[in-house]
Amino acid sequence: MRCVPVFVILLLLIASTPSVDARPNPKDDVPLASFHEDANGILQMLWKKGRSCCPSPTSCCPWGKRK
């Protein structure tokens, strides 16, 4: 029962704090779309390299081996 007043006070303090962004957005911030495009490009490059070196996925690729 001693924890209830503390819990109520904490809730009141949390509710009364102003909502402020933790990190302001700088003008030179890179949008996430460019990171997504870069990731897709890298994955496509790795996929093409993996398929060209391993004609049969079960022969030489470690990620293609099946148990």
UniProtKB/Swiss-Prot annotation:
Residues 1-22 form the signal peptide. Residues 23-51 form a propeptide. The modification Tryptophan amide is found at residue 63. It comes from the Eukaryota. The keyword Signal applies. It is found in: Secreted. Expressed by the venom duct. Keywords: Amidation, Disulfide bond, Secreted, Signal, Toxin. Its main location: secreted. GO terms for cellular component: extracellular region. GO terms for molecular function: toxin activity. Contains 2 disulfide bonds that can be either 'C1-C3, C2-C4' or 'C1-C4, C2-C3', since these disulfide connectivities have been observed for conotoxins with cysteine framework V (for examples, see AC P0DQQ7 and AC P81755). It holds the Pfam family Chi-conotoxin. InterPro entries: T-conotoxin. Belongs to the conotoxin T superfamily. The cysteine framework is V (CC-CC). This is Conotoxin Pu5.1. It comes from Conus pulicarius (Flea-bitten cone).
